[in-house]
């Protein structure tokens, strides 16, 4: 009898092991965390091998060991101009604003968005919820950079990393002169700087391009930008840093409005996990080194630069979504035929951050009911309160489709509130693609909005569960 029981137990163990292996196989996906800081093969295509950088600007990234375990990765970055710049920045709306946010906001207000020379950034420690001492540390970082530039009160500060810990400030400030000496204007200098601001990012995010303005058709202007962020990403803004520099002569009087317009349509239209960080900052510096007529309000140059900056910011923001923690998909959410742009944005945002939608996409499941569910509750003010008359969403007029990125016809899931007979094989083909668009037609107006998001995978939990270790 003991032998028989042993045999049965052995078979059960083998069956259990087989089930475990089967489940592991089912649950596995194409994402895998980078090894030893290497860039995943699928992400290498997003890292530029050359660039066109604005005149008068230089950049650097060095390792100082903000985190004691980091002995190789760059973690302090400098981006600066050889002359004072007009500058503007958009900051997080989180009530617990980090010390560098408070410092940089105050500096821009004091200087009237003028006379800014550069930006100093550290990764590995957010310097957030660190009290008066943290604010003093942000000031010390700026002062160390100012001394290198031969200026005073001319440096913005950014930090990213773990919240609630003080910076190893002496280690940082004593090495800022070394970062200054390492500055240069080549592509490698800019790319190293972009690497220095990363935390859980799997690849550095850097874009550069040239453009023209109507009043100076013979002048080639340049714009370059770097950003970071892979988690705690949600509008207004997220654990997201962005530095954009241009050699166009943009007036300090219009720079804040131009930047806000661009950010609202780019960095404030992405979400990874719905969390808004304490440190979010996107800064724009314009030094006018390329010459030409100053860009001021109510001119063709203003409109042209606004378009350039918005398109540029959108491309930068999309890189953040493509590097979402554990993400395997890049998803565009488009809500059209809405009664108002505000309603369209709210619905798109709600769909984009829905855990049920995001996990269904990861599982390659055409569960359009989750999309419809998010659409239905998105404009209800608060759970538990009586539902208001939400006239912006009329079930009988609502349509939902998958739009393939390979150029083939859309797959209709819901038409005028009635479910379609879904071709599951076709749906599976679409959901196998890395890029996907979800289109919601409301049929209640002519406004629209677009959000970009990614899926949720098992790795998202692993990355964030291990973040402080």
From Swiss-Prot:
Identify this protein by name: Arginine biosynthesis bifunctional protein ArgJ, mitochondrial
* Active-site residue numbers: 239 (nucleophile)
Location in the cell reads: Mitochondrion matrix
What else is on record for this protein? Answer: This protein may be expected to contain an N-terminal transit peptide but none has been predicted.
Q: What class of enzyme is it?
A: transferase
Reaction(s) the record says it catalyses: N(2)-acetyl-L-ornithine + L-glutamate = N-acetyl-L-glutamate + L-ornithine; L-glutamate + acetyl-CoA = N-acetyl-L-glutamate + CoA + H(+)
Q: How is it modified after translation?
A: The alpha and beta chains are autoproteolytically processed from a single precursor protein within the mitochondrion.
State the pathway, as annotated in the record. Amino-acid biosynthesis; L-arginine biosynthesis; L-ornithine and N-acetyl-L-glutamate from L-glutamate and N(2)-acetyl-L-ornithine (cyclic): step 1/1; Amino-acid biosynthesis; L-arginine biosynthesis; N(2)-acetyl-L-ornithine from L-glutamate: step 1/4
UniProt source species:
Neurospora crassa (strain ATCC 24698 / 74-OR23-1A / CBS 708.71 / DSM 1257 / FGSC 987)
Q: What Gene3D superfamilies does this protein map onto?
A: arginine biosynthesis bifunctional protein suprefamily (3.30.2330.10), ArgJ beta chain, C-terminal domain (3.10.20.340), L-amino peptidase D-ALA esterase/amidase (3.60.70.12)
Which InterPro entries does the UniProt record give?
Arg_biosynth_ArgJ, ArgJ-like_dom_sf, ArgJ_beta_C
Task: Tell me the protein family, please.
Answer: Belongs to the ArgJ family.
Write down the NCBIfam families for this protein, in alphabetical order: ArgJ, PRK05388.1
A Pfam family of the record is ArgJ
What biological function has been recorded for the protein in this entry?
Catalyzes two activities which are involved in the cyclic version of arginine biosynthesis: the synthesis of acetylglutamate from glutamate and acetyl-CoA, and of ornithine by transacetylation between acetylornithine and glutamate.
Listed GO CC annotations: mitochondrial matrix
Residue numbers for the site described as Cleavage? 238-239
Transmembrane as a keyword? Answer: no
| E.C. number(s) listed in UniProt | 2.3.1.35, 2.3.1.1
Residues that bind substrate: 199, 228, 239, 325, 464, 469
Cite the GO molecular-function annotations of the record: glutamate N-acetyltransferase activity; L-glutamate N-acetyltransferase activity
Record note on quaternary structure: Heterodimer of an alpha and a beta chain.
Q: Which GO terms describe its biological process?
A: L-arginine biosynthetic process; ornithine biosynthetic process
């Amino acid at each position: 009898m003991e032998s028989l029981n042993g045999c049965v137990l052995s078979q059960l163990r083998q069956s259990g092991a087989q089930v475990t292996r089967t489940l592991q196989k089912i649950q596995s996906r194409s994402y895998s965390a980078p090894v030893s800081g290497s860039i995943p093969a699928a992400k290498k295509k997003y890292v530029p091998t050359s660039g066109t950088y604005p005149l008068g600007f230089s950049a650097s990234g060095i390792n100082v060991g903000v985190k004691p375990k980091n002995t190789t990765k760059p973690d302090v970055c400098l981006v600066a101009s050889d002359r004072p710049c007009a500058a503007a920045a958009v900051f997080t709306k989180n009530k617990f604003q980090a010390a560098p946010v408070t410092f940089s906001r105050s500096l821009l207000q004091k200087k009237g968005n003028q006379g800014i020379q550069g930006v100093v950034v550290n990764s590995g420690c957010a310097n957030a919820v660190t009290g008066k001492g943290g604010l003093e540390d942000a000031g010390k970082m700026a002062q160390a950079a100012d001394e290198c530039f031969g200026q005073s009160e001319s440096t913005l500060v950014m930090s990213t990393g773990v919240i609630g810990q003080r910076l190893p400030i002496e280690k940082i400030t004593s090495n800022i002169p070394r970062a200054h000496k390492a500055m240069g204007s080549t592509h490698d200098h800019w790319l190293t700087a972009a690497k220095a601001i990363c935390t859980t990012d799997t690849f550095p995010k850097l874009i550069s391009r040239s453009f023209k303005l109507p009043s100076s058709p013979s002048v080639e202007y340049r714009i370059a930008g770097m950003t970071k962020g892979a988690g705690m990403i949600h509008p207004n803004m997220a654990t997201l840093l962005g530095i954009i520099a241009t050699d166009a002569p943009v007036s300090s009087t219009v720079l804040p409005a131009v930047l806000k317009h661009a950010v609202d349509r780019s960095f404030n239209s992405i979400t990874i996990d719905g969390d808004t960080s304490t440190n979010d900052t996107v800064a724009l510096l314009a030094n006018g080194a390329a010459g030409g007529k100053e860009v001021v309000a109510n001119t063709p140059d203003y409109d042209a630069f606004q378009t350039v900056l918005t398109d540029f910011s959108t491309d930068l923001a999309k890189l953040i979504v493509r590097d979402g923690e554990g993400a395997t998909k890049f998803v565009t959410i488009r809500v059209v035929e809405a009664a108002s742009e505000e309603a369209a944005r709210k619905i798109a945002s709600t769909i984009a951050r829905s855990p049920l939608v995001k996990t269904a996409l990861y599982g390659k499941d055409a569960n359009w009911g989750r999309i419809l569910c998010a659409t239905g509750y998105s404009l209800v003010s608060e759970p538990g309160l009586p539902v208001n008359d939400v006239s912006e969403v009329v079930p009988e007029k609502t349509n939902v489709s998958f739009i393939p990125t390979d150029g083939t016809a859309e797959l209709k899931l819901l038409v005028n509130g009635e479910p379609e007979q879904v071709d599951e094989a076709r749906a599976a083909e679409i959901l196998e693609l890395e890029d996907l668009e979800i289109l919601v037609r409301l049929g209640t107006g002519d406004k629209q909005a677009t959000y970009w998001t990614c899926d949720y995978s098992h790795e998202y939990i692993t990355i964030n569960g291990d973040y402080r270790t």
